Amino acid sequence: MSAAEGAVVFSEEKEALVLKSWAIMKKDSANLGLRFFLKIFEIAPSARQMFPFLRDSDVPLETNPKLKTHAVSVFVMTCEAAAQLRKAGKITVRETTLKRLGGTHLKYGVADGHFEVTRFALLETIKEALPADMWGPEMRNAWGEAYDQLVAAIKQEMKPAE
């Protein structure tokens, strides 16, 4: 999966699948981002406690403006990083953003299992967002690999401050 000097090898075929599907989903990213997070909380209700803005909130998740803002931001960043993966040969999220993401995920105790739940929720959200004839093993693998690359980049930054 990785080439010399840490460059990511993401095939043209996978890139084409990601770009084609992202073009369809991008128009509805606010709604899809929220659906993505609702799936995470459906699978792992305790994950709500990892988000300070949800801990003491009585606002239903579906209408929580802070969750909506966070959800679209995460969904768009994830999809844009996937779309740029082949061309850039690496995750294109700014280094400062990756450091912040790594620090935040470390602070809130995010573990491998959380990333797995998020991966499953992302793939299910994408599957539901696309026409049925577009979704299949190739599409699942393309998005799964792109997500795994993003997670690997975040995990690289999940180190306690020295």
UniProtKB/Swiss-Prot annotation:
Keywords: Cytoplasm, Heme, Iron, Metal-binding, Nucleus, Oxidoreductase. SUPFAM superfamilies: Globin-like. Induction: Under anaerobic conditions. The keyword Iron applies. The record marks R140 as: Homodimerization. GO terms for molecular function: heme binding; metal ion binding; oxidoreductase activity; oxygen binding. Heme b binds at K66, H70, R100, T104, H105. It comes from Hordeum vulgare. Binds 1 heme group per subunit. Seeds and roots. Its cofactor is heme b. Belongs to the plant globin family. Homodimer. A motif (Homodimerization) lies at residues 42-46, 112-124. This is Anaerobic nitrite reductase GLB1. The keyword Oxidoreductase applies. Phytoglobin that reduces nitrite to nitric oxide (NO) under anoxic conditions (e.g. during flooding or in waterlogged soil). May not function as an oxygen storage or transport protein. Has an unusually high affinity for O(2) through an hexacoordinate heme iron because of a very low dissociation constant. Its EC number is 1.7.2.-. PROSITE patterns: GLOBIN, PLANT_GLOBIN. Residues 9-159 form the Globin domain. GO terms for cellular component: cytoplasm; nucleus. It is found in: Cytoplasm; Nucleus.
